[in-house]
Amino acid sequence: MNSMHIDQELDTRGLNCPLPILKAKKALTPMQTGQLLKVVSTDKGSLRDFAAFAKQTGNALVSQETIGDDYIHVLKRR
């Protein structure tokens, strides 16, 4: 993931479902097609939630990883 150009980063640490998804949806809206949004969350359920969100919205889930207590998701705007 370090070699990707992230266009916007969103810190949702400390927020529980559905807030990380809602904030990501709001952040993605003004972004251009192909731009990348990195979301950092501490909600373990976000791993499942972001996979479902990407499938429902047509945005691509480029990567997910866990670093310590953080769950990092990278979405590509459709």
What are these regions (language model features)?
Residues M1-M4:
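Short, compositionally biased "basic patch" segments
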Residues I6-R13:
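Short amphipathic
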Residues D7, G34-K38, D70-I72:
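Intrinsic-disorder/low-complexity, polar/charged segments enriched in Ser/Thr/Lys/Arg/Asp/Glu/Gln
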Residues L15-Q64:
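Amphipathic, hydrophobic secondary-structure cores in small proteins
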Residues I72-R78:
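Core SAM-dependent methyltransferase catalytic element
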